[in-house]
């Protein structure tokens, strides 16, 4: 157990028996009231966001974590099969553990898996940006190039991304895995 004042953004704590990642932690000292810490956390099992007010003297249980690099190999039913980059051990990871970023996982991508002190998978971190090929989008016309709108495109992983009008089938684009937004066209 450690004081809430020693916890920082990104720490994983046990809150009400469940692992939560601290997304923001702000110290507040209102007028004539006692100081407190306002925390925004995300439950790593359910994915729900939780807001909680800790007193300045409160203690929390910080979970000791281990981060390892894994490479995606293939799908096995509803699970993703990953291989440890150093020991070549394989593990199965559920889609729920990966979250919404699972739509950008492609063969050979390297992910970081966060394990708890008891060996359970807490979260899976994708690279911030991935490069994917556009497989299906509407053809561009001469008028489209003069406007600055977007159009939907299907990428090689099956995800749908809104792209600028100039992007065509076969183009390689960089996408932000956190939001699913188009970043830029990659020139190869």
Swiss-Prot record:
Q: Which GO terms describe its molecular function?
A: translation elongation factor activity
Q: Where's it mainly located?
A: cytoplasm
Q: Record's Gene Ontology CC terms?
A: cytoplasm
Asked if Cytoplasm is a keyword of the record, the answer is: yes
The record's annotation in Gene3D superfamilies points to: 2.30.30.30, Nucleic acid-binding proteins
Q: One Pfam family of this protein, by short name?
A: EFP_N
Q: Which GO terms describe its biological process?
A: peptide biosynthetic process
Q: Where in the cell is it found?
A: Cytoplasm
SMART domains from the xrefs? EFP, Elong-fact-P_C
PROSITE patterns named in the record: EFP
Can you tell which superkingdom this protein's organism belongs to?
Bacteria
Keyword annotations of the record: Cytoplasm, Elongation factor, Protein biosynthesis
**Record InterPro entries:** Elong-fact-P_C (IPR015365), NA-bd_OB-fold (IPR012340), Rib_uL2_dom2 (IPR014722), Transl_elong_fac_P/YeiP (IPR020599), Transl_elong_KOW-like (IPR013185), Transl_elong_P/YeiP_cen (IPR001059), Transl_elong_P/YeiP_CS (IPR013852), Transl_elongation_fac_P (IPR011768)
- Give the metabolic or biological pathway: Protein biosynthesis; polypeptide chain elongation
The family classification in the record reads: Belongs to the elongation factor P family.
The entry's function note states:
Involved in peptide bond synthesis. Stimulates efficient translation and peptide-bond synthesis on native or reconstituted 70S ribosomes in vitro. Probably functions indirectly by altering the affinity of the ribosome for aminoacyl-tRNA, thus increasing their reactivity as acceptors for peptidyl transferase.
What is this protein's name?
Elongation factor P
Gene name for this UniProt entry: efp
């Amino acid at each position: 157990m450690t004081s809430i004042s020693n916890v920082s953004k990104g720490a994983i704590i046990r809150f009400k028996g469940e692992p939560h990642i601290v997304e923001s932690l702000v110290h507040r000292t209102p007028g004539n009231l006692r100081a407190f810490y306002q925390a925004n956390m995300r439950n790593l099992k359910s994915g729900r966001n939780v807001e909680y007010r800790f007193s300045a003297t409160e203690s929390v249980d910080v979970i000791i974590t281990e981060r390892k690099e894994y490479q995606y190999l293939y799908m096995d039913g509803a699970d993703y099969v990953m291989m440890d980059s150093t020991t070549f051990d394989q593990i199965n990871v559920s889609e729920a553990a990966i979250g919404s970023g699972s739509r950008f996982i492609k063969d050979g991508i390297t992910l970081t898996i966060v394990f708890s002190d008891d060996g359970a998978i807490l979260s899976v971190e994708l690279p911030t940006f991935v490069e994917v090929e556009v497989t299906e989008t509407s053809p561009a016309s001469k008028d489209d190039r003069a406007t600055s709108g977007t159009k939907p495109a299907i990428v090689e992983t099956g995800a749908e991304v809104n792209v600028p009008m100039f992007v065509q089938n076969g183009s390689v684009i960089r996408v932000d895995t956190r939001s699913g937004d188009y970043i830029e066209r990659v020139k190869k």
